[in-house]
């Protein structure tokens, strides 16, 4: 016989499943910030990104308009996004 879960159980399961579906934190090119500022901000605020990766990602955003910085759970992406916005970088989150 199938087990029927209650509403609270469904919410808990949905929450756990959403953390398994990573989102993409995307950096957008801008004409305001210096390249050095972008690299330093990425390294200082996203632990997964090394200096070399930050430089590469900054150049991709500069040349192509956008670049995916990281793929991670939504909550972490929102935290990183707030940190980057505080430092005047333009970011979006894509599901």
Walk through the language-model features, giving the residues of each.
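Terminal domain-initiation and capping elements
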Residues: 1-95
């Amino acid at each position: 016989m199938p087990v029927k879960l209650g509403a609270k159980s469904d919410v808990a399961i949905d929450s756990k499943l959403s953390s398994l579906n990573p989102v993409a934190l995307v950096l957008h090119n801008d004409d305001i910030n210096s390249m050095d500022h972008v690299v330093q901000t990425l390294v200082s605020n996203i632990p997964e990104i090394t200096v070399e990766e930050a430089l590469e990602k900054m150049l991709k955003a500069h040349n192509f308009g956008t670049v995916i910085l990281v793929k991670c759970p939504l909550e972490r992406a929102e935290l990183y996004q707030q940190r980057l916005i505080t430092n005047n970088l333009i970011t979006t989150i894509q599901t």
